[in-house]
Amino acid sequence: VDLFRKARSRRSGMSTTKPSKLKEIIPIFTGPWAGKPPGFGQVDTVVHCGASLEGNMAFTVNWTDVATLWGKRRIQWNKGQLATRASLSVIKEKLPFPMRGAHPDTGSEFINWHIKDWCEANQVELTRSRPYHKDDNAYVEQKNGHIVRRFLGYTRIDCQAALPAMNDLYEVLDQYLNHFVPSRKCLEKVRIGSRYRKQYDKAQTPYQRVLTHLSIPEDVKANLRREYGQLNPLLLKRQVDMLIARAFKIQHDCGNPRSS
């Protein structure tokens, strides 16, 4: 028993601060977001569990840049710390601009030493929202429903072999959404009596927001213009539909039908 406890508590090369203290070390950030430059994103996981949380299943890591609403998604097997770190690494490499900040909720897939050390090594500022305050992560929470649930629904994804096809889907879907689908950003939320009144900006695509943002270098914008010039929204949408069908066929053929 003593040997087991020692093995569990050994954290070679890391701080001796207890893991329970991480929530005290990682600062809470509630805004304002308006002054944050591109690269500061909100991040969350979406579970693909169907009607049951039992057993193994897929999770989508959803990252939304607050300044431009540029989004990237990555599906992974379960929501372990190492799997989540790997997903963040892929997302970071695929962003058109440097990742500067990651702002999750208080979930254990993000609030752990693997993620904290990864953020420090990559010069990514790690902050967190308050427990039970979804509004602290409103930008990514909105995308959870508008994108992940809209395109993948609530079906249980418990076939690991389907994940590569799901990530192929996300690659094309992200291109389609970032370049061609406009959305509005909430600028102000004012309480009037028992209701809230929200003020939104003009609807723009994330691509348009990147091109007009003064802090993004011209070489980044030039690369995106070249990419945009090679894309056809109709063909991308057809690809998205085809990849959804392919991914769910794999899931249907090898998944657990009783847990869908």
Predicted regions and their residues:
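Charge-biased, low-complexity intrinsically disordered regions
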Residues: 36, 55, 170-173, 227
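Mobile genetic element proteins and their domesticated derivatives, centered on retroelements
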Residues: 44, 63, 69, 88, ...
